[in-house]
Amino acid sequence: MGSRDLISSLPDEILGKVLSLLPTKRAASTAVLSKRWNNLPALVDKLDINDAIGGPGGFPEFIDKTLALLTNSTTIKRTSLNNEFQYGESQVNTWIRSFLERGCLQLYLNAQSLYTIDTEFFTSNTLVELTITGGFSPDGLLPPGGVFFPKLKTLSLVLMTFVDSDMYELFISGCPLLEEFLLRNDEIEIPPVWNALVSSPSIKRLTIVHHFPNYREAHDGCWFRTPNLVYLDYSSYVPDWYEVDLGSLVEARLDLRSWERLRDEKAGGYGDCDSVYDDEEYPDDPILGDVTNLVTGLSNIKTLHLSPDSLEVFYFCCKSMPVFHNLLTLSFESAKKEAGQCCHFSSISLLT
C-alpha cells in the first residue's frame, strides 16, 4: 500500500495557518515540494523573518521574493524582522514600508546594527501593535497631518532613540488611540535623548525604565500628563522635580533610584534610614531629587509596589507625605518597620 500525502489534501486555508507557525524562511521553502505547494506561502498571515536562520547570504533576496509572493495575500497579522547583520539602509526601509503597506496589524523590529527609519512613510492605518528595539532610530519629516498610527494601541520602544528628543512627544501624539506604552532606555554608553515627557489622554498602562547615572542632566525633571492612566511601572534615578496628572491611577510599581551619595557602599548595600548618611562626612552635600509631587499624585491608588531604593528616596527626597486613603495593598522589599516610618496609610495589606 503506497504512502498517502494527507497534509496536502487539507484545505488551503488550513495549510496557510500551518505555514504561519513556521519561520518564514522554512515556510517559503515548502514551495518546491510540489505544484500543490507552489502558491501556499502566499497564504501565510504571519511573517517571522530572521537572518540568524541560514545567515546573511541571500537574505535580502529572500525577503524580496517573499514580499513578491505576498502581493495578493490576505492581511498580514504579525510581522517580525530580526537583523543581526548589516544591510543597506534604503533596503531595510523598503522592507518596512512593504510590511506597512500590506496592512500589518502587529510589527516587531529588532536590529543589532544602526538604521535610520524614514518617518515620512512610517505610518499605517491598520497597525495596532508596534515594537521597536535595538538599532532602529526614526528620523526625518513627519507624515502628512503628523499622525503616524491612527489605530495603534500598544507601543514599545526598547533601547531605541530619536535623533530629536522632541520626536518622542510628536510620536506619541501621532497615536491618538494609544493605550499601552513601554519605554526602556538604560544603555549607559548611549547618551539619553528622551525629553522626560509622556503626554497622552488615552494611555492606560505605562512602563518607563530610564537609567542614566552618568548623565545627571537627563534627570532635571519629569512630566506624566496621563489623566486616564490606571497602571504605572516606573524605574528611574530621581529627577529634580515632577509634574504629574495621575487622577485615574489604580496601581503603581516604583523603582526610584537614589544618586551615589544615598548608597551605603561600605556596607555593600543599604543601611537603615538613620545610618545611610554620615553628616560629618557629607556636611555640605545636598540631597538630590524631589519626588514630592509624584508621591502626592499617587495618593489615590489602591495598590503600591516599592523597591528598597524607593523607600530610601521616599524618606530623603519627599518634603511631605500624603495619606493614602484608598490603598489596599502595599508590597516592598524591606522591613515593615522602615515602611511604617516613611509612609502613612489608612488600611492596607502588607506584602514583603
Curated annotation (Swiss-Prot):
Name assigned to this protein: F-box/LRR-repeat protein At2g29910
LRR repeat segments: 101-124, 149-173, 175-199, 298-323
Alphabetical list of PROSITE patterns matching this protein: FBOX
Annotated ranges, domain F-box: 4-50
Stored CDD domains: F-box_AtFBL13-like (cd22160)
Organism listed in the record: Arabidopsis thaliana
Superkingdom of this protein's organism: Eukaryota
UniProt keywords, alphabetically: Leucine-rich repeat, Repeat
